[in-house]
Amino acid sequence: MNKPFAFENLNIVIPKRKSNSHKGINGRVLIIAGSNGLGGAGIMASEATLYSGAGLVSLYTHESNVKASLIRNPEVMTLGISEFFQISEKFNVILYGPGMQKDEWSNKMLEHLHNLPKESKLIIDAGGLQHIKDQNRTISNEIILTPHPGEASNLLGISISEIQKNREETAKIISEKFNASCVILKGNKTVIYLNQSKEIYICENGGPELSTGGTGDVLSGVIAALLGQNLSIHEASLLGVAVHAKAGEIYANKYGEISLNATALIPIIRKLLKK
């Protein structure tokens, strides 16, 4: 049975911070994103993570993107990666894929998905989805996949029109095929499929204002921050999708549907999460 949900009706609360809390316990998020020439995706994702409450945000990206990231958000610990690196166990959430393409640098980054800290939750978005399709090894961590219809079409080898005819079943099939704990199939009335409970949720917020580049990067960053603050995959997925879509509605009501740029969502999301 499909369960509709909206931001206005969710009863999901980010845990209140204790008076003696510190940055290390409020979410330690690593974002691996941004091939050469696609640095904006990693910058947007990391900014969304930062402004959604994560205590520590690190961005591992192509060396060419480091300067822009540090100018935009000096709070994000940005590292230019060219060779093998070790992923520390300090990260409890890892987001992989925004701004990744099929190139040598991205292929090097892919190798690390099979050597993650066991407790780290993993979000795979955008170019990362192509990478998991192309490799045969199973990733043992809890995974959230966040495809749009085009990416879902590529994952399953069927047409976008077939995807759109049965979005709920598509999300379920992707989850089963790639052993994902959760699949978020983006688009009009975003679908969330939870593998463990077999529940399907359909978001009633949002509209065509979100159909612009970068909004998916912002969404994945928000969800990463919520996971880092000890929400479950279920809670972080529902709240992340709903607050992102509601932010789009608020922007469209004020400025119209056609002028939204993805980073304009971030300050609105910041205010909504305060509630």
Regions found by a protein language model. Give the residues of each.
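Small-residue (G/A/S/T)-rich helix-start motifs and N-terminal tracts that mark the onset
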Residues: 1-121, 130-144, 153-275
